[in-house]
Amino acid sequence: GGCYQSCEPHTLKCGSVSFEAKCKSGWSCYPVTDNIASNACDRFKSCQDRWATVKETDAPCTSCVPGFQLTSRGYCSQDLNECNRNNGGCTNGKCINTEGSYHCDCDRGYLATSSRTKCEGVECEPLTLANGKVQSNKGSWIFGSRALFTCDDQARSVLDGPSYITCNLDAAGLTASWSGTSPTCQNDDEHDRFAEVFHLRFHGKKLDGVSLVTGLSPRSTAYRCHKDSTCQGIMTRAEEFEVSATGLTVYDGGVLTKTLGQSRADGDALTDDASMDIYTKVDVSSAAASSYQDVLDAMVGTSLGCYTTSSMASWEDYTLDDGRATTCNQICLQAGYDYFGIQASDKCWCGQKPPVEKVGDGECSTVCVNQANILCGSATTANIYQVYRDRSLGFCYTGNLGTETVPSAKTKDECVTVCRGQGYYTANIRNSGECFCDNSLPGGPRVDPTKCDEDGSGHSTVYMTNPAYFMSNDQGAQINPMTTRMYDDTGSVTGMTTGLFQRLPGLRIFTSDRLVLYSAEEVQFHDVQNDYADTCGEIKRIDGESDRSGDLILHFFHFRLSQLAKHTSDRASRVYIYAQKVVIDCDIQVQFSLMIRATKIVVSTGKVFKILVGSESSQIEMDVDDVKNNGPPRNLQQMKDSLQCARMLAQSWDDTEKQKLAFNILHEMTSPTAGNEAQRSVQTMASALKLQLEGMFKNDIHHVPSYSAAYFTYLMKADSDIVNAYAARLNALEVITTSRDDFLNYTQELEKIHQDTSIAQAKKRFDETMKLYKKEDLVYTKLQAAYDTALTNLRGVIPTFRKSIEAQEDHLRFKALLSFLELGVAAMDPAAVASVSKGFYDDVTDIAASSIWGIDQVVTNIDSFTDVMTNNLNEMMSEVKPYDGTKYAYEIEKVANMHVFVEEWRNFQVEVNNILGDDTVSALGGAGDYGRNLVKLTNIGMALTNAMINRAEKTRDAAQKRTTWDLLVEQGRRTTEVIKGFKAANSERAAANSVVAEQIRDITSEINGDLANFCEAYFFEKLEPCPKSTQPRFGGDLLSVQLSISRAEREAASLGLDGSPVSREVTITNTDASEDCIDVTQCPVTVFKRDRAFSYEVPIDNFDLSDWDKYRVKEIEVKAIGATPDRTETDLKLFVRSSGSFSGKSGGTHYNFLTDDFFCVYEYDINSPIDAPPESASGRCTVYARGSKKDMTRYATPYAAWMIEVD
């Protein structure tokens, strides 16, 4: 208050305020007088008044009211900007200065205190552990912290469950919850010292059936170790741990069902097994105790010396109960730290960097309570050690030994040192003395470590060289020869050299907590130049999609990192890039954390050498362990964009490379399973498309869709109306800068368009698809009934056929035939088989293997598929419950196999005709009826199988459209909520902008999907790609998409108008032949009246797609020469069907196409000269006609295979 005139402490009372008067630094002292005291009181009062004048006799003011500071004239009227110093103390937030005060605007995951001058992190609920302790690696339960669990009695208890769980933020950043449930402490009566050392030394903290098998405590007598697991190395070092291999106990499905002692007591034989070794303890007496202690002490990293704990403010501390440095090492290792320290044997410290205040070793002379060879600090100091990590691997491999030979290095340590110095990541020791350096794990499988001890074996033991990284690869019997993952488990790495990609060409993921690069495919390293062609176009980020904490999300299909500066700002703290392909084409040095998730990453040689992020940048909020296994988190919008791109690429029938790219995109999308419902819905659609592509690749089948020109004309018009409606409102929003009401009005209009137009359009698409589904379902149902009738009729004539067979002298031979025809060769009577001649038996066996089994399989699949599809239809028709696409995805895979069974039907029909054509068989009574019924069953079965395929395809299409509809409904709900918040002033304009942008993005994506469907139909109609102006524009705005729609609308009107010049004629002759004829082309019409049918194949050799129009069928005519009425009726019907499958090639590529079934009926009175001339009865079916009302692609194939039936 200006009262600085006294040398002695002196209390002055100014009104109701008391303060101490003392001398200010740099001022002289003189005795205190009442006058001085009075002046001091006056000056104190004036310093509390912002506008009080300063008298010349007044002592200078030294302080003002909080929030203000002195001007040069002595006034307290100048605002004090608290934010200029240490951000106002707003750690984890931004300081906002106001006149005379300030407040904190907190980052995501932090909430302001009641005074608004601090930001406190969102925390999870505290945890407890019965018979154990729970400690946080951050000293609190703030989000991102880990709860570390330990049991009190570590000598006789073990954790059953995770050793730690993580506190995770919710999507809004307002609450937090634990990633899992707490474990329990389970008692274990058996304990020995070897068990403890074994468990710690060989990463036994995770008892999950991989390193050690769950079900047996790590501190019990017998231990199990899979030979393909991390603990395999102990087999070569058993003596070091004073254990011996004793064989295998009873083993059942990965669970040890008996202890070693029980097996011995029961007299079980202990046999060798390739998958497991059992180790038991040996006597760890006092004589062996020193060896045990040496091993335990070796599990502590290098000592850095003694440091004061006062210089360790940034370190985390934990309670240490057992007084062992080994335990502290394990705590800090699990928490992800590089260094640990022990204070007075009871406190464990963990940190990322060494402390700064080092003292003499004499200040840390106290030894650990239970580890006498290790120093454990004092009351005010701590011994600091590097965290011990067993990075040596020590695994024995076959295969590549390395790219660099080091003759001078003979030992492991020498080899590792040399290889590290030369920049390699692995050191390989062969024959216990030859050193090789490399940057990847060997190409061969891992083998028994004892093989590496054999001179001349050619095997090598592999060690890691760089303590900052840990390499991992795909596990399995055959190790992937290339490294697939490299991660920094210390969290300290903030950059990398791109030379890493060159040395590790198979690298797919690099992970630290500030820099994450992920590629679903192997990273490519070459001079890319223009190797980033926009397969699907460029998808830019959604405008407004960034929050106030500085997180920025960018969406691209193809992105060059040299353009990163255009899309970021100084405000960014974390940048997330989601793309199909990322080109690293320049050095990158940024101050924000960077995460890239792409299907492919390409590094340009000679243009880029390093990627660095700021060491003080914010850590990326993610579970690093999950990233190591599954890659960075997904983004919903990128998943929807990726699916749309894959759909377009999958429809590139003339480009198999694009289809393979589509498959890779879908594979990356579908594995592993996404975390939330919306992402899983998109993932389900991707799974179905992936299965469809798998079927195409496996069976070389391309299903031709069914669309009409009228449908596309309507669809393009509707899409155009939607674009116009959205564009008008968006243009208005762009010019609104101040009026909140105007912004709200236009935003609400966009919401209404979304509800009335976009969602309505999505529902209409679904309804139209359901109409096609119902049409296919009706055909399927009729054919299914006909199939059941045909099967019943076939079984009805079997008794007559049986009696004729049994009446023959050689009845055993015919009994074998009968059992084969009924059930296949597996059911043939053994006695009958024995009496059959070898030649006949061989014929029957061959037919059974290729045909009868196939028919059984077809019938089985049809029966099961009917139930599945019926249930799916019922769910899809629900207007309330969203359709769960996971229920049909697996069945789509079956559809791919159904194409094969169409051919099985045909083969079966031919082979059965061969059997029935045997003179002896055809002479039997009832053989003709049996043959005719069997042939009809095969014809209907073929048509039924095709109908099932068609219906399944319609199911997939309907399910996709239903899922899209559901997603739009959900998006509309979120949009409504955001607008409500904006209306109530609970949310900012940026949030409304973001959700509107997302809405526009989805609509544009759907319209692009319509364009992709149009281009697919165009290809099958014109046999050439659709015009570029009609192709989807994935990176375009609404207006650019509008241009494509307009052109597609014009092109759609011209589709389906060209007729075909090709006609087919099928003639039935020789109508005077016997009624019991076998050759289907030699039978009279009266035979066909008894449900006889036959197949007709259009002869096509080396069909080329360029000859499409030569084989596209305009009409097919069936003639029955000399047809006459029978005794009962004169009506005659001709049924003509085709499977719609054909093969062809284009540019050397072979295609198999499948369209919808063609079916027509021609009916007339055989006595009428108008309907049928006397010399023949004929029916003519129009297959492909001129006119836009016909389905443009329904009859686009030549229909090479026909089934004709006369009734």
From Swiss-Prot:
It comes from the Eukaryota. Residues 300-391, 392-476 form the WSC domain. Residues 79-120 form the EGF-like domain. The keyword Ribonucleoprotein does not apply. GO terms for molecular function: calcium channel regulator activity; calcium ion binding; toxin activity. Glycans are attached at N745. Keywords: Calcium, Calcium channel impairing toxin, Disulfide bond, EGF-like domain, Glycoprotein, Ion channel impairing toxin, Neurotoxin, Presynaptic neurotoxin, Repeat, Secreted, Sushi, Toxin, Voltage-gated calcium channel impairing toxin. GO terms for cellular component: extracellular region; host cell presynaptic membrane. Residues 122-187 form the Sushi domain. It is found in: Secreted. Expressed exclusively in the four pharyngeal lobes and in tissue located at the base of the teeth. No distinct expression is visible in the putative venom glands or elsewhere in the pharynx. Disulfide bonds join C83-C95, C90-C104, C106-C119, C124-C167, C151-C185. Its main location: secreted. InterPro entries: EGF-like_Ca-bd_dom (IPR001881), EGF-like_dom (IPR000742), EGF-type_Asp/Asn_hydroxyl_site (IPR000152), EGF_Ca-bd_CS (IPR018097), NOTCH1_EGF-like (IPR049883), Sushi/SCR/CCP_sf (IPR035976), Sushi_SCR_CCP_dom (IPR000436), WSC_carb-bd (IPR002889). Pfam families: EGF_CA, WSC. Gene3D superfamilies: Complement Module, domain 1, Laminin. Potent venom presynaptic neurotoxin that promotes a long-lasting increase in spontaneous neurotransmitter release at the peripheral and central synapses by selective activation of Cav2.2/CACNA1B (N-type) channels. In addition, it drastically enhances synaptic-vesicle recycling, an effect that is prevented by the Cav2.2-specific inhibitor conotoxin-MVIIA. It activates Cav2.2/CACNA1B by shifting the current-voltage relationship of channels towards more hyperpolarized potentiels in a reversible manner. Dimer; probably disulfide-linked. Interacts with Cav2.2/CACNA1B calcium channel. This is Glycerotoxin paralog 1. It comes from Glycera tridactyla (Glycerine worm).
